[in-house]
Amino acid sequence: MDELLEKMHNWMNDYMNQFVTDDEEVMQGIRIKMIHTGYVTAIAKELAEHLKLSKHDIQLAYIMGLFHDVGRFRQYSIYKTFNDAQSEDHADLGLKVLAEEMPYMQELEQADAELLRFAIANHNKKTIQPTADKRKLLFARLLRDADKLDIYRVLMPYLTPDGVAKAPNFIKSAASQLVSPAFVEAFAAGKQADYRQLKTHGDRKLVRLLWVYDINFSWTLNKIVERGYVDLIIKYLPQQSGLEAGIKRLREYIKAKCAVEDRIDI
């Protein structure tokens, strides 16, 4: 597996470098995803180690982190947006890229390849596809946590009104700073909102807070809290009726979740 890991890592570096361009608008998005890929790969490995997985499974987690956003590069180069609703689902696109362009998938054991595809396919969905396979669920949860933890880092510079204009086409800079009523309602209830309905900068911020309820491991949530991501997002929420109830519920949930010891059942 060590040799295969090295070949996959080298392939991914070469693949990402194909999208380097003199077009600074495109390059802004490509650069963000190149850096994000490195962070998520490292986080996935660290979380797998925290969960005391086997060396083989730690390496699988690494591979999943490495390839989880491979579809983003083709997506952004074509559509100049990371908005799946305005282009293509980037996880599904990533699986196409791996099938069409990555020559080492067949070197994985069939069960490992299925795990990889399942985790990547589900890393960006509202919920994980139902399955009785505990290993698939574990790796999907692990990858979702690793991805979310780093996306918090990515988005922090774009929270302020001044930062909005610098964001690489997440949402049009002229969009409202307020939160849409459906998102306020979901926040107050502690439920996930439909990402496809994102319309405003306020919606985008609130969705990141709602992610807290979808974090699977207390290790991840503790990292999110320790790095100040939750407090910073709350700081830059609009002064809007209905949000206080959601903030109170969120803080109570975080306190309880962070105190739970991570356990896995495979």
Positions of predicted regions on the chain:
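Acidic/His-rich, divalent-metal-binding segments that scaffold phosphate/diphosphate chemistry
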Residues: M1-D92, D133
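Divalent metal-dependent phosphate-bond-processing catalytic cores, especially two-metal-ion Mg2+/Mn2+ enzymes
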Residues: D2-E3, G29-G38, A42, E46-S54, ...
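Short low-complexity stretches enriched in small and charged residues
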Residues: M16-T21, K52, R74-S77, M102-E109, ...
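Alpha-helical scaffolds flanking conserved acidic
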Residues: L53-L66, Q110-A119, K136-L142
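Hydrophobic/aromatic-rich structural module bridging two neighboring secondary-structure elements via a short loop
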Residues: F73-L115, K126
